């Protein structure tokens, strides 16, 4: 029954693209929060002496 095969193919095709479209729209509508840099941290200024070449 090729009609049933075509019907299942069309159903899966449209369901797949519809789900991808819904996921893409949801991802586009989510707000991206801008995280500010953490200025309270300090960097370590001690030299790294582990890499000594003979």
UniProtKB/Swiss-Prot annotation:
Transmembrane segments: 8-28
Any GO BP annotation: proton motive force-driven ATP synthesis
Keyword Ion transport: yes
Main location: mitochondrion
Top-rank taxon, per record: Eukaryota
Swiss-Prot/TrEMBL keywords: ATP synthesis, CF(0), Hydrogen ion transport, Ion transport, Membrane, Mitochondrion, Transmembrane, Transmembrane helix, Transport
Subcellular location: Mitochondrion membrane
One of the Pfam families matching this protein, by short name: ATP-synt_8
GO molecular function annotation: proton transmembrane transporter activity
GO annotation, cellular component aspect: mitochondrial membrane; proton-transporting ATP synthase complex
Keyword Ubl conjugation included in the entry's annotation: no
Membrane-topology annotation of the record: Single-pass membrane protein
Task performed by this protein: Mitochondrial membrane ATP synthase (F(1)F(0) ATP synthase or Complex V) produces ATP from ADP in the presence of a proton gradient across the membrane which is generated by electron transport complexes of the respiratory chain. F-type ATPases consist of two structural domains, F(1) - containing the extramembraneous catalytic core and F(0) - containing the membrane proton channel, linked together by a central stalk and a peripheral stalk. During catalysis, ATP synthesis in the catalytic domain of F(1) is coupled via a rotary mechanism of the central stalk subunits to proton translocation.
UniProt family annotation: Belongs to the ATPase protein 8 family.
Assembly and binders: F-type ATPases have 2 components, CF(1) - the catalytic core - and CF(0) - the membrane proton channel.
Listed name of the protein: ATP synthase protein 8
Source species taxonomy: Eukaryota, Metazoa, Echinodermata, Eleutherozoa, Asterozoa
